[in-house]
A protein has these predicted regions:
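Compositionally biased terminal segments of proteins
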Residues: 1-185
Length: 185
């Protein structure tokens, strides 16, 4: 079954691994930072399907982020890879996700054969979604909170560590609180 990014057609772990293998072959790199929602497919054994609706894996080579453009061109959106498999890589950079300054201290390392995936922990990933603040991010954060995969107190602490103005941090924290309220049954 192809992953199309539609509810009920979630990107599976083997598809994430496929994208990583293809990215490694294209970039001649073996270590990648993953920053998008599909990180949950590597961090949680049986994640709620609502968290896996994206058909893209946001990543960049950890040692040579500039090679993300090669990945994007070869297996990105609208590529033959995407047309064939229904999912794709989104070659991004270190600046793409707004993460706490110390996120790497908590990063989860996932070894997939010869490939290393460096993933923000779930709270740091949720913080990046709070900072982005799009409707799809609201849905994502609500599910994390609803299913007790993250907690609001830790989110608030991590938001305070963002390299943003105090005003921006306050807006992001308020946004997270609203998602927590919405997540309550």
């Amino acid at each position: 079954m192809l992953c199309t990014g539609l509810p009920g057609l979630e990107m599976q772990r083997h598809e994430i691994e496929h994208v990583l293998r293809a990215a490694a072959a294209i970039s001649n790199e073996t270590s990648f930072v993953l920053v998008g929602s599909q990180v949950v497919g590597l961090l949680i054994d049986s994640p709620p399907g609502e968290l896996l609706v994206s058909a893209e894996l946001d990543l960049y080579p950890s040692l040579h982020p500039e090679k993300a453009d090669l990945i994007d061109g070869a297996i990105g959106a609208l590529s033959t890879f995407h047309d064939t498999f229904g999912y794709h890589a989104d070659g991004v950079g270190p600046e793409t996700a707004t993460l706490p300054s110390d996120w790497m201290q908590r990063a989860k390392i996932v070894y997939l054969g010869d490939i290393t995936a460096i993933c923000p922990d779930l709270h740091d990933l949720a913080v990046s979604k709070c900072a982005a603040g799009r409707p799809k991010d609201a849905d994502f954060v609500r599910v994390l909170l609803r299913d007790h995969l993250v907690d609001l107190e830790t989110l608030q602490q991590r938001i305070a560590k963002l390299s943003v103005t105090a005003g921006a941090a306050s807006v992001i924290a308020d946004w997270a609180r609203r998602r927590a309220t919405e997540a309550r049954p």
